[in-house]
Design a protein with these regions (language model features):
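A short, N-terminal "cap"/entry segment at the start of jelly-roll beta-barrel domains
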Residues: 1-39
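Conserved short histidine dyad/triad with adjacent acidic residue
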Residues: 26-31, 35-58, 78, 88-92
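Well-ordered beta-strand positions
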Residues: 35, 66, 86, 96-98
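Short, well-ordered beta-strand segments in beta-rich or mixed alpha/beta enzyme
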Residues: 43-47, 68-70, 105
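Solvent-exposed residues in well-ordered beta-strands and their adjoining turns
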Residues: 48-50, 73, 110
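Glycine- and acidic-residue-biased ligand/ion/polar-headgroup-sensing regions
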Residues: 59-74
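Ligand-binding loop in jelly-roll beta-barrel domains
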Residues: 61, 78-80, 89-114
Length: 114
């Protein structure tokens, strides 16, 4: 019988209370992990003004992003709150806040089969 994980419900205070982790060795880039399993992950990414994530690709996962606040350049488009981006696996991209006041982005890495 398959084990079912319990649902996760977080208020805005609960999200704010999550551990803020640096993303690799990048200055000005942090994230909070909301949920993860063996092949997928959801979280909140913060890129401070004047910083960028750096060009990279996710070899095995689709990347979904929804801009929550602020602005950033993603795939060459200047995106603000409410904007959504889907990046298929293998596509190089960046999250660039070097010319904006920074941004907060909800992200989901999803395995192609999931």
């Amino acid at each position: 019988m398959e084990t079912v994980s319990p649902p996760i419900v977080l208020t805005s205070e609960g999200v704010e209370a999550l551990i803020v982790e640096p993303l690799g060795n990048l200055d000005g880039v942090t994230h909070r992990v909301l949920w993860r399993d063996a092949s997928s992950m959801a979280g909140v990414l913060s890129v401070q003004a004047g910083h960028r994530l750096g060009t990279h690709a996710h070899r095995f996962n689709h990347h979904h992003m929804w801009v929550v606040e602020g602005c950033a350049t993603i795939l060459g488009a200047e995106l603000g709150p409410g904007s959504y981006v889907h990046i298929p696996s293998g596509v190089y991209h960046d999250i660039d806040a070097t010319t904006t006041g920074g941004c907060t982005v909800f992200y989901l890495y999803q395995s192609p089969g999931g």
